[in-house]
Amino acid sequence: MNRSPKPSAPPTLDRIAELGVVGAGGGGFPAAVKLAARVSTVIVNGAECEPLLHKDKELLQHLAEPMLRGLAAAMALTGAREGIIGIKEKYTAVMAGLEPLLPPNVRILPLSDTYPAGDEFLLVHDAVGRIIPPGGLPKDVDAVVANVETLANIGLDRPVTHKYLTVAGAVAAPVTLAAPIGTSIGELIARAGGAAADRIAVLLGGAMMGRLAASLDEPVTKTLGGLIVLPESHPLIERYKATPRQIARIGRSACDQCRFCTDLCPRFLIGHPIQPHLAMQSLGFSTSPTSMAAGTLYCCECNLCSLYSCPENLDPKNVCVASKPAARERKLEWKGTPDSIAAHPLAGDRRVPTKRLIAKLGLAGFRNVGPLEDLGAAPRRVVLPLKQHAGAPAAPVVRPGDRVAAGDLVAAPAAGALGARIHASISGVVRSVDGAVVIEA
């Protein structure tokens, strides 16, 4: 399953940047930049709280050794004294398999099967008991958080050319695959036995925090963790198709101010100044589709308020998101101090069980499995977007007509710019470099 021999020495920050390693959990932040921090704890995010996705759990079983090598490298680079691996407590076999491999300064943190257990603010609070300040980063509380796959990529010590992801939902055989970056999502659906509905829509990244795919030709990127395939008529797809104006108009007329959206908000429960019900309330006093409620900047966009908490099926999350640019412009920022933040006394009791969330989303009828399997034959064509990471797009270093081998550098960030290198995921000929490097075998 895409294994490699053990590297002779831990990788340096320059080596990690050279390999093109970025946050594989969705953020895409360059790993070499993150690991330049000095902290006491490195936390491995293996919570994987998005419904129906199994990628991280499968990697903890099949790529445990490279992941632990990556963790050791991350701890050495940051000066961390402790490593903590967050895993859902229900995965007892995964934890049992990991335990014998752990060094004395690394421990497993069993996590509740709730959503969003994988939010790094919640994970840090669970792991070390400290609350990241609003707008802050884990390093502000002496920690670094890295995804399982990110650390495995560091431990494998080779250019990042493949992405692990789960294909789930309305497919014949849900599966987790290692796909060459740039593979079309349509090819992955075919590898999962094909769609189990005539007309489908695909959520890229997950049911809660994903986005609708524009077409089945969209490529796999370094940050894509899963595909949720659903019938086009599924209620969840209808929710994702709503326009900002529809969201604001309906929210303005139908919100009953029950404040369930705030009472269950994960960030509110750790003391952050985000109260989605106030954002909804402010819609009633404005003709704009955006809200002026202070605190919307600190919405983590987990979508729990919109897709679970609200009894009226309104969309507080997108109301908060729509207001963020105006809130930044007006500098509606948190003015508190770190020691003024405290978790809600009922925070632990208000966590949402994943099983209940799956039922509310209308996903209970789909198989909740995703075994790791080989993709099979490599695609004949890949599309490598120049922007699949945090920071500026990479600049191509190849031209149409160039022949490349898998692992060759095809794009790189400008000197001094935040970005990541991109490597060929298949061998072939470069056909174009406009916005993406297209390679055909």
Predicted regions and their residues:
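Short, well-structured beta-strand-loop connectors
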Residues: 263-265, 399-412
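Short, Lys/Arg- and Gly-enriched loop/turn segments at beta-strand edges
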Residues: 235-239, 411-425
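Flanking helices and flexible, charged tails adjoining ferredoxin-like Fe-S electron-transfer domains
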Residues: 2-9, 20, 25, 51-53, ...
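Gly-rich Lys/Arg/Thr-decorated short loops/hinges at beta-loop-alpha junctions or inter-strand turns
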Residues: 43-56, 171
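Hydrophobic alpha-helical positions that pack around
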Residues: 81-187, 191-198, 206-208
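Ferredoxin-type iron-sulfur electron-transfer modules in oxidoreductases and energy-metabolism complexes
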Residues: 230-252, 260-263, 267-343, 379
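Histidine-anchored nucleotide/phosphate-binding helix
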Residues: 42, 61-78
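Short, compositionally biased
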Residues: 209, 244-250, 417-434
